């Protein structure tokens, strides 16, 4: 379970979820018709080794990401989510935005794999050990960012707005923000703090995009945590419900919309249909997760 002020690297606690998601992105890239291709996802997996690499080589057919009930749909989910945020950044760049803020950057490689306009600066915020891992792995394969990239080692439960300004962020210029796979790992109070920080720093012409999940009922959440613990006792390595906060400060579209942003929420299930991927039924392991998830983008005039 989480504790106040807890920290992590790429193989522990919340950091391990970034590796799990990177593995899903790497599996998506292996498809003949991928929704998005992140060539660095596989590099991160192989740098860690173990099951993250084995599943890519077909050596772990029982891996959670290979199951029909969950894995197939989760890989589709990550392909769709990656595509959504990639296209969001392209729209922001086309609109003239040259400051990009990636909150809880994890193993996000967009600074290296997307085509950025000249004079773009990308600010990546995350735990120091996570940023160290990414930098060392990418340097090891001689990868170079396609825009100016600035690392900001900070906990998003601390004064990250000041750390961002100290790194050269200009709140008077438009910016593009993402919170991808982040909000569920923050309690409602920290989500509110995060949204407030974005709203305070985002000038006119700014964009924001977030992924959010509607909370489960307390009974369903407690049952999911108990089932996960039981699976761990049987030797399975599952750690998700024990890491998340089953809380939400407010739906993002409502929160930003009430503060002058034009927000567009897209239920994940609708987006999966839009990009030609199946939507899992409610009786599958992945179904309820997909049904609760929404992708939101907003623009400040």
Curated annotation (Swiss-Prot):
One of its GO terms (biological process) is methylation. Keywords: Methyltransferase, S-adenosyl-L-methionine, Transferase. InterPro entries: Ppm1/Ppm2/Tcmp, SAM-dependent_MTases_sf, SAM_mthyl_Trfase_ML2640-like. It comes from the Bacteria. S-adenosyl-L-methionine binds at residues 126, 155-156. Pfam families: LCM. Coiled coil: none annotated. One of its GO terms (molecular function) is methyltransferase activity. Its EC number is 2.1.1.-. The keyword Transferase applies. The keyword S-adenosyl-L-methionine applies. Belongs to the UPF0677 family. Exhibits S-adenosyl-L-methionine-dependent methyltransferase activity. This is Putative S-adenosyl-L-methionine-dependent methyltransferase MAV_4873.
């Amino acid at each position: 379970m989480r504790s106040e002020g807890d920290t992590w690297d790429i193989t522990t606690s919340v950091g391990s979820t970034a590796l799990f998601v990177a593995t899903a992105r790497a599996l998506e890239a292996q498809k003949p018709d991928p929704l998005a291709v992140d060539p660095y996802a596989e590099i991160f997996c192989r740098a860690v080794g173990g099951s993250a690499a084995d599943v890519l080589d077909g050596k772990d057919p029982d891996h959670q990401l290979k199951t029909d009930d969950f894995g197939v749909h989760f890989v589709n989910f990550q392909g769709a989510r990656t595509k959504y945020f990639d296209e969001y950044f392209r729209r922001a760049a086309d609109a003239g935005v040259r400051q990009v803020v990636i909150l809880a950057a994890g193993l996000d490689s967009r600074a290296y794999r997307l085509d950025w306009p000249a004079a773009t600066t990308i600010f990546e915020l995350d735990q120091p050990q996570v940023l160290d891992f990414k930098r060392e792995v990418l340097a090891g394969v001689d990868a170079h960012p396609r825009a100016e990239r600035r690392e900001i080692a900070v906990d998003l439960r601390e004064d990250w707005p000041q750390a961002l300004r100290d790194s050269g962020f200009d709140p008077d210029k438009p910016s593009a923000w993402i919170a991808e796979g982040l909000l569920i790992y923050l309690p409602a109070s920290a989500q509110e703090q995060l949204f407030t920080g974005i709203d305070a720093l985002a000038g006119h012409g700014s964009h924001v995009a977030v992924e959010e999940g509607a909370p489960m009922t307390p009974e369903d959440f407690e049952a999911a945590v108990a089932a996960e613990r039981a699976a761990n006792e049987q030797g399975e390595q599952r750690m998700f419900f024990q890491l998340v906060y089953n809380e939400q400060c407010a739906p993002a579209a409502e929160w930003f919309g009430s503060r002058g942003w034009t927000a567009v929420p897209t239920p994940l299930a609708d987006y999966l249909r839009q990009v030609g991927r199946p939507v899992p039924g409610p009786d599958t392991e992945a179904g309820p997760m997909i049904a609760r998830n929404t992708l939101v983008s907003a623009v400040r005039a």
